Curated annotation (Swiss-Prot):
It comes from Thermococcus kodakarensis (strain ATCC BAA-918 / JCM 12380 / KOD1) (Pyrococcus kodakaraensis (strain KOD1)). Optimum temperature is 90 degrees Celsius. Is extremely thermostable. The lineage of its organism: Archaea, Methanobacteriati, Methanobacteriota, Thermococci, Thermococcales. This is 2-dehydropantoate 2-reductase. Its EC number is 1.1.1.169. Transmembrane segments: none annotated. One of its GO terms (molecular function) is 2-dehydropantoate 2-reductase activity.
Amino acid sequence: MRIYVLGAGSIGSLFGALLARAGNDVTLIGRREQVDAINKNGLHVFGAEEFTVKPKATIYAPEEPPDLLILAVKSYSTKTALECARQCIGRNTWVLSIQNGLGNEELALKYTPNVMGGVTTNGAMLVEWGKVLWAGKGITVIGRYPTGRDDFVDEVASVFNEAGIDTSVTENAIGWKWAKAIVNSVINGLGTVLEVKNGHLKDDPHLEGISVDIAREGCMVAQQLGIEFEIHPLELLWDTIERTRENYNSTLQDIWRGRETEVDYIHGKIVEYARSVGMEAPRNELLWVLVKAKERINRGKTRNISEGC
């Protein structure tokens, strides 16, 4: 399968490496530093598994349409990334978002009706250019967005599973996206404020109550919007924490790199949707404010993330 991965960060690089190792025609589209490192030395994955591959890598999307375009950029870059890649989105190209947050699939639907929503609980960390820590094997769920089924989705799931990405298919992609956003509201919120690995949120009994309260708040908002879940977000939360207990969440990684975070598309979206149905989401709003404050304080500063691995 010809696959383009738009966004060669932690998850994009991990998925691209696994798919390339399995023999797929993979092109990673990313930042110049990452592209140069991959083209020079290959892409090295270590942690849960260790291997090196050398997929194609470029800073610009090729003009030839792929079978599958995987969206792995940060949510705040989705609109710009899709616009830059629009020339390669052919009539038969499918777009799959494996991003955190809410609203990315809606943007993709403006370019093509062939959109899949995806969630993954794999833990990954780009410790340096061309080098990805696979901090924990998780599950991946994909489906036609917002709901429904298509044979190509099943084909993608088969390709992913053959590549070692544990993948299942859903007919309720929007429900899974909301469940994952609620999981991220806990892990990325508390984990970033406390600056701890995911596992700490489960190991510290004093954090269980607030974790449940944050998740329930998101569930109440989703319920008012008519969102149905195939898996309860709390079940997904504890499973994700256990699978990725040695990982630092992506929001904290961004803070340590002095970069913008995706908190507007996680907590911010939950608060936005809550207000749209006449509700408040005070816990999510508090975490939103606190993470944004850390983002401003650390903007432009960098920390050697490999020190925490």
